[in-house]
Regions:
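Phosphate/dinucleotide-binding and metal-coordinating scaffold of catalytic cores
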Residues: 45
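Short active-site neighborhood of thiol/selenol oxidoreductases, capturing the structured segment around
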Residues: 48-63, 83
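Conserved strand-turn element in the central/C-terminal portion of the radical SAM core barrel
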Residues: 55-61, 126-129, 186-191
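Structural alpha/beta surface segment adjacent to cysteine/selenocysteine redox centers
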Residues: 67-159
């Protein structure tokens, strides 16, 4: 659905339109709830015993991942479900066609979702290509130290919040250290192979789930 320069690609985005029309004076019954309000995610009082699993397919160049990753980790912790983080390559690095219009929509949609959720989303420095590969090459090592999620979170913040050039040694160093890892150790491992097959397995699992 398109209205006055803004796309609404699903029912879950119509609250943006309702709020926009309300700000323009179109809401004549302000006491009446929105027809399609934003769905808040709450953990509730009942905790799982680990029998349920939350799978997170995380891409280091995805705006959506950047605003959802930390919240997904927190949700798993709060609810007691088992968290399974499954990193994947960005769409354009695995051959998924993406028009400029689609890219613009994704970035603008993420921005309005971030504002609604009060999630940081400010300066973007594109990590496409080598920065993503270099970070993923460190991921198995970070996981062995119990810092895999911290590494991904740190990279996403650098790329989508702080505007860090992760293509430089200085940028990657800040990512590593902000994740609580030792840069001198990381320098010896950057660029190593051994991570690609796991990401390919994750890609296939994601496609099998009907996701892209």
């Amino acid at each position: 659905f398109y209205y006055a320069g803004e796309w609404y690609w699903g029912v879950d985005r119509l609250y943006h339109l309702e709020n926009r029309l309300s700000e323009l004076g179109g809401d004549k019954q302000v006491q009446v709830p929105l027809i399609a309000p934003r769905q808040e995610i709450t953990s509730g009082d009942v905790r799982d015993n680990g029998s349920l699993t939350l799978e997170v397919f995380a891409s280091l160049r995805s705006p959506y991942t950047s605003i959802a990753f930390d919240r997904a980790i927190a949700l798993a912790k709060d609810t007691g479900v088992t968290l399974h983080v499954r990193p994947i390559l960005p769409m354009v690095m695995r051959g998924v066609p993406a028009t400029s219009e689609k890219g613009i929509y994704i970035f603008t949609d993420t921005a309005r979702e971030a504002r609604a959720a009060s999630v940081p989303y400010r300066r973007f420095y594109d990590p496409i290509g080598e920065p993503v590969r270099r970070c993923y090459s460190l991921y198995p090592w970070a996981c062995s130290l119990g810092k895999g999620n911290q590494l991904l979170s740190s990279f996403l913040r650098a790329a989508f919040v702080d505007g860090v050039n992760t293509n430089t040694e200085r940028g990657l160093k800040s990512v590593v250290e902000n994740a609580g890892l030792d840069w001198m150790d990381a320098k010896l491992l950057v660029g190593q192979d051994g991570w690609q097959q796991a990401l390919e397995d994750n890609r296939l699992a994601m496609y099998d789930s009907g996701l892209w």
